[in-house]
Amino acid sequence: MKIGFTYDLRSKHQPDENSPADYYGEYESGETVAGITGALTTLGHEVTQIGNITSLVKFLSEGKRVDLVFNMAEGRYGRTRESQVPSLLEAYQIPYTFSDSLTLAICLDKGRTKEILKLAQIPTPEYQVLEPETDIETTIAFPLFTKPLYEGTSKGISEDAIIYR
């Protein structure tokens, strides 16, 4: 099978002086990309390392195609960034691994995800979406656990994320 491999390399994303320590948390190392490529090749597949969404757009615009895309791309900008590659692949009717674009767009927004879970009556801990620099006024029991609203792969989470009264 011809498999395209999409990913975002750490080396292609440069932090600035205001970037958090976990800036690279969701991007792949060259070692990871090589390891996954090797594993797929060992299984008998022909693997094309495509890279990020910009490379995928070029790949597709040149008329190149694969049977399946192994998608690990994180996207780059905006709160629906993880859904960018799957959306493009859906438009080209190319199957891919992992979650679809709608699921990725919803789940990156933790507040929206919690709303959907509650509407579906799926048990989930109480939550509150807070704006920056606001006092915490809540009836939710302490300690609280805070997370960035639009991040994944544990970015922005440390022992400082626990708030005691």
Per-region residue spans from a language model:
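A short, structured active-site edge motif that brings together acidic residues
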Residues: 98-103
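Active-site nucleotide/adenylate-binding loops and adjacent lid/helix of ATP-dependent enzymes
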Residues: 1-4, 62-63, 105-165
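ATP-binding N-terminal substructure of ATP-dependent carboxylate-amine bond-forming enzymes
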Residues: 1-95, 108, 131-137
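Hydrophobic beta-strand scaffold residues
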Residues: 47, 95-96, 124, 144
